[in-house]
Amino acid sequence: MPYRSTEVLSPGPGERAPLHRLTLTHEQRHLRRKLLHLENDDVVMLDLKEPVMLADGDLLVLEGGGHIEVKAAAEALYDIRARNPLHLMELAWHLGNRHLPAAVEEGRILIARDPVIRAMLEGLGATVDEVNEPFHPLHGAYHQHGHGDHYRHG
């Protein structure tokens, strides 16, 4: 059954169960107009006014009622650890200087795998491990969130 969506919401308390779930990578979650294929072979025509970066848990509101939940796919990432908090800030600076998408968490940074960057980080004294996790990088200083109506965004 084909669906159409022109609106994205962040979930609020007491949301109903979604009709379907759609698992997308970080790169796939940045979109505006696209035909999305669900696991059951149904399709959703997403047609938004502006490009958005969908977050894990966002809801595609379907014309005619219901919604589809967006899930962040596990991706091949590097888990970067530092000797101390100052060293972690230095590593983050080097990654930011290269304009790399990065998820900064307490005690670690996550980035997409790149052997050249891994060698640089290890040369700077970082511990770099390969992990497979959903990727939620920080938005840049010039990023504008494209959601119209929403309850929360974390």
Swiss-Prot record:
GO terms for biological process: protein folding; protein-containing complex assembly; urea metabolic process. GO terms for molecular function: nickel cation binding; unfolded protein binding. It is found in: Cytoplasm. Coiled coil: none annotated. Keywords: Chaperone, Cytoplasm, Nickel, Nickel insertion. CDD domains: UreE (cd00571). One of its GO terms (cellular component) is cytoplasm. It holds the Pfam family UreE_C. It comes from the Bacteria. InterPro entries: UreE (IPR012406), UreE_C_dom (IPR007864), UreE_N (IPR004029), UreE_N_sf (IPR036118). Belongs to the UreE family. Involved in urease metallocenter assembly. Binds nickel. Probably functions as a nickel donor during metallocenter assembly. This is Urease accessory protein UreE. The lineage of its organism: Bacteria, Pseudomonadati, Pseudomonadota, Alphaproteobacteria, Hyphomicrobiales.
